[in-house]
Amino acid sequence: MAGDDEDRAVPAAEGAPPPSALPPVSGLDVKAAEAEHARLSEEVAQANLAYYQEDAPFISDAEYDASKRRLEEIEARFPDLAHSGSPTAQVGAAPDTRFAKVPHRLPMLSLENGFSQGDVEAFVQRVRSFLNLASGAPLEVTAEPKIDGLSLSLRYEGGRLVQAATRGDGAVGENVTANARTIADIPGQLSGDGYPEVLEIRGECYMSHEDFEKLNQSETGRVFANPRNAAAGSLRQLDPSVTAARPLRFFAYAWGEVSASFAGTQMEAVRRMQAFGFQTNPLTRICASVSEMLSAWAEIEQMRATLGYDIDGVVYKVNDLAYQARLGMRSTTPRWALAHKFPAERAWTRLEAIDIQVGRTGALSPVARLHPVTVGGVVVSNATLHNEDYIAGRGADGSEIRGGKDIRIGDWVEVYRAGDVIPKVADVDLAKRPSEAEPYAFPTTCPECGSPAIREEGDSVRRCTGGLICPAQAVEKLRHFVSRAAFDIEGLGAKLVEELFRDGWIAEPADIFTLQDRYGPGQLTQLKNREGWGEKSAASLFQAIEKRREIPLARLLFALGIRHVGEVAAQDLARHYGSWEALEIALDTARPAALAHRVAEDAALAEREAARAEGRRARPSEARAAALAQVDLSPEATAAWTGLIAADGIGPVLAMSLSDAFANERERAAIDRLVSFLTVLPPEARATDSAIAGKTLVFTGTLEKMTRAEAKARAEALGAHVAGSVSAKTDLLIAGPGAGSKAKKAAELGIKVIDEDEWLAIAQG
């Protein structure tokens, strides 16, 4: 996707603190964990959408990795927060609706990330433990550069290319066959012989640095931000002739569905792919120990600047394919591979100004305006400063970061770019601080509308209280409303929305659906006379708007731009309630209970603060109960609130945000006006062909043909839940030799019991 001429600092989650500035997960209570889980879930889900679908990432790889790691840590400590819709259980993002969908016969998974020697050692130890290998037993691992491009799957039948698809969400990708045929590195017909009748080759589409520079020099308008964006935007073109004119390359490194095995090791497979006519990375090598793996990583990192294409780490893979098969997959990553990421690139420059951007939820986000400096081959002039605590040298828990050094205009600051996206300010050189530099005074009023900007207890950011009267919030909500994962109206992008808002043609989403009445037949000249418009383009816009009068419930919920309601949460809500009407009724009914919940949480917070001041043990549960006892709630309100917070992936923080939005008179009126123009479609029913999907399994006794870990992983991959004990909720018990009390209890409860051979028939199904 083409980017602006200058990099624009758009904070990942408005005003969100960097993970390094957050308190340890072990120090979080349930309320704090819920709030942070909701924020991180939205941040990671939006980052997935921007990176995989829109080719316009707005956070760095390092920031993304750190946020996802922290999300995983929170879910590990608070298991009730984990759910099937969490970004930790997702791969990529939903496929772009402009392209035909292609189901992947074998999922295109992501890779587990590592960042240190300890991570690499732990990976090897996990592999050995899973395979039950002795410490001295040989274990070969391949090491290859991790190309920073766009993942692509190529399907060959009889040696002929019949289909090319992007990763998409890992299960369903986008059909880009016509575009892939124009790439010189992708053979239309496989070379040699001995290839399987059906062969899916997977690899990375990328652009070299030299070709990237030439492409940007040839562009007369907007230029690409980096080679990865250029490659992704070039491949995902509706017109194949555009792709053909772009200098795309392709490295093959993996495979999906095959009708017959074509290699016994990863390295042999790489050589066979090369013989079939594919480019494979010449730096791929075999390592026999952790020390050799780390040496390969260090050598490849040293070569990074001279390779001529972008890489962001080294990928390790267990070489023996029989071992790979035994190790199998987690829900989103293979157990037999690890991506060992490179550290961020850094440079020093002067901070010339601090500007405040106002996001769609009202968050005031500080942006550093820098003296231009080259970092990682890209000129950087903007960087995010996260929030006022980060500027002041404090973490979210009040602890010092950067040794307590604050950031001031005129300072020399260290800037880093990890993943070639939005830069961050990492450090300050106090020795070079100008004597006249004053501490930065974070604004307490909105710079866009003048409304008070307040910071609520437990929040890391200040937010404008102006709501829709704030032009910055209004236009950002409109930009979000027309984004690809929301209404995605063809011809109505963010730029046009800003123009129409500026000129007074639209002020809220509902106005989009009255454009034709106001500027259509009889008044068409007003629209067609706009710069760059004509009668045909105006008519096309109206037609595109008409098509979006029917909208899936999940898209509508995401499009509303309610705080914490990201794409995944919107899908969870849609599945839980099934219709717009049911959701409205539930929220209206639950409102008194939502307010009571807020009173109870405030009481719990006051109890904690009082206990801290008095040096005693806090009793927040008792404080909550006492506060709730003062509120007279109907059973219907209690049931509606309980149902909302119990919905998969929701929880109290998101539920409160949703309730507040629907209870706000001005916001609810805008929502009602919008919905009056729409037909809201219910979610499609989920389908699965697994015989054990949704069922609860228990394993007992000794399994002789696979390890317990392998069996559990396979069951979960087929959609089952594996429990540790037998109960009335158990659907199936798999009993090996030595089964004891669990088998007896299953018999008493009438639960079906099968042996390992029957289990293998299901697992290999």
Curated annotation (Swiss-Prot):
Catalytic activity, EC: 6.5.1.2
GO terms assigned for molecular function: DNA ligase (NAD+) activity; metal ion binding
Needed cofactors: Mg(2+); Mn(2+)
Binding positions for NAD(+) per the UniProt entry: D61, A62, E63, Y64, D65, S110, L111, E144, R167, E204, K317, K341
Disordered as annotated region, ranges: 1-34
Reactions that this protein is recorded to catalyse: NAD(+) + (deoxyribonucleotide)n-3'-hydroxyl + 5'-phospho-(deoxyribonucleotide)m = (deoxyribonucleotide)n+m + AMP + beta-nicotinamide D-nucleotide
Record's GO cellular component terms: cytosol
Enzyme type, top EC level: ligase
PANTHER family: CHROMOSOME TRANSMISSION FIDELITY FACTOR 18, DNA LIGASE
Function in brief: DNA ligase that catalyzes the formation of phosphodiester linkages between 5'-phosphoryl and 3'-hydroxyl groups in double-stranded DNA using NAD as a coenzyme and as the energy source for the reaction. It is essential for DNA replication and repair of damaged DNA.
Protein name: DNA ligase
Protein's organism: Paracoccus denitrificans (strain Pd 1222)
Gene (UniProt): ligA
